[in-house]
Amino acid sequence: MRLVVVAGPTASGKTALAIALARRLGGEIVNADSQQVYRGLDVGTAKPTAEERAAAPHHLLDLVEPGEGMDAARFAALADAAIAGIAARGRVPIVAGGTGLYVRALLHGVVEAPGRDPALRAALEEEAARLGRPAVHARLAAVDPAAAALIRPNDLVRVVRALEIAAGGRTPSELYRAHAFREDRYDAALLALDPPRAELHARIDARVRAMFAGGLLDEARALEARFDGALPARLPIGYAEAAAHLRGELDLEEAIRRVQVAHRRYARRQVIWLRKERGVAWIAPPHDVEALARRVLEPRPPAIR
């Protein structure tokens, strides 16, 4: 069975290409975007619309509530089940998303890491509350600069987890290097969209403005009400800024600007991650769907398996 993966930075057109390939190949789409697993966070995560979901079946959207956890190991297990079901129906599984850790876990397995340390976790969360999340991120940067560079300073959940791992004696980067992700769990065609930077930034900026005009503020308002103003530590980009605007802490243009900058930085991290993957076929627009459909179904030569 051939697995098709459509990856790339945010706003690069992954959903549109995945749907076009699904319609051409008779496929179903498996989400690999860590932000789109949350229920009720639709506009701010650019989740496929009802029309897009009607154009091709989608899996692994709306799995957990905001504030609940989802990690790469759990994602890979859920994706394995979805892919098996798609294959059993005689359809082509198409994985689409920009979360590199999820794609890597699915294609090459998961690193075995130390378990949770509740005492350390509590101490780090207290430090973040007292000194700010960037202070805890700086602690990670001191012990594992490479891991810190891949995690947003405000993503306290991932920062704390990385420090938990480092406290076990080996940093996350050391564990990843030792694992090396050599195992190929699937025969996969990995496509990565690669629009010119100026074009990508323009698309990001336009998308963020459309989010603010199209319901992001309503979603942030609902979160504020649900969590009584104390938003979960790990939310997709944009919700904290939208909530700050609703509280009168940011004017609208500044909130939009900050979210645009955050998405551009996220896109850069996504590209850096993908550049490290093996066997990536970088695709520049415009996309010839017919040619790509033929290409992804061609068996890989044994030498590059």
Swiss-Prot record:
Residues 33-36 are annotated as: Interaction with substrate tRNA. Keywords: ATP-binding, Magnesium, Nucleotide-binding, Transferase, tRNA processing. The record marks 99, 121 as: Interaction with substrate tRNA. Its EC number is 2.5.1.75. ATP binds at residues 8-15. GO terms for biological process: tRNA modification. GO terms for molecular function: ATP binding; tRNA dimethylallyltransferase activity. Monomer. This is tRNA dimethylallyltransferase. It comes from Anaeromyxobacter sp. (strain K). The gene is miaA.
